[in-house]
């Protein structure tokens, strides 16, 4: 079974040919990609990378999509200058690579990003969205930072520990039915534990026939059968942010 200490490999999927609408900035000790909302509503969303890093065009595309819905978005380099995973890399070395990129040891970076959003972007309401590795970050943040009003964890691997179910604010979990990284058994455990321990609003949604990465690493035009699920998941993501931020 996949878990945070021994995850299964995931394919990069379709790398989008996308330039981006934002700009790269320095946020204290880390770099970040920031897109300002065309409407200054005092709302911001932290968008967390997958294992392929903060410069992946697909993640920036998602950040810009969210920004177009009224949020200033920021994609921080949560690897803090360390190299992202190489899609052509030897997966046998992945566990060792991951040791220095612990998705639950990012509080210093989160603190810096929150200061930047409040001081430089005048954000008063903040949410977070993350994909794959970033989905784990979202789960951690939503159990640690009460000031983050809403979270969307997209195919983030689940750790079975009591402390990860005490969510501080509403969180949406998106999974894929045919995910080789996250078995449905893990999703079922998450649902059961949230029922037992969570007192805030949450939703766990599994998309039929989809695979790991379908929300942000699969082109909408790649398969007519997949397109409705991709669009629905992205719509659900935006709706969750709109409802709770």
Curated annotation (Swiss-Prot):
Instruction: Write down which residues bear the modification named N-acetylalanine.
Output: 2
Q: Which InterPro entries match?
A: AB_hydrolase_fold (IPR029058), CMBL (IPR042946), Dienelactn_hydro (IPR002925)
Q: So where's the catalytic machinery, residue-wise?
A: 132, 179, 212
GO CC annotations on file = cytosol
Q: What class of enzyme is it?
A: hydrolase
Keyword Aminoacyl-tRNA synthetase assigned: no
The alphabetical list of record keywords is: Acetylation, Cytoplasm, Hydrolase, Phosphoprotein
The signal peptide here is: none
State the compartments where it is located: Cytoplasm, Cytosol
The Swiss-Prot or TrEMBL record annotates one GO molecular function as:
hydrolase activity
PTM sites of type Phosphoserine:
223
Highest taxon listed in the record's lineage: Eukaryota
EC numbers, comma separated: 3.1.-.-
Family indicated by similarity: Belongs to the dienelactone hydrolase family.
Q: Explain the purpose of this protein.
A: Cysteine hydrolase.
Protein name according to UniProt: Carboxymethylenebutenolidase homolog
- Its source organism is Rattus norvegicus (Rat)
Q: Which gene encodes it?
A: Cmbl
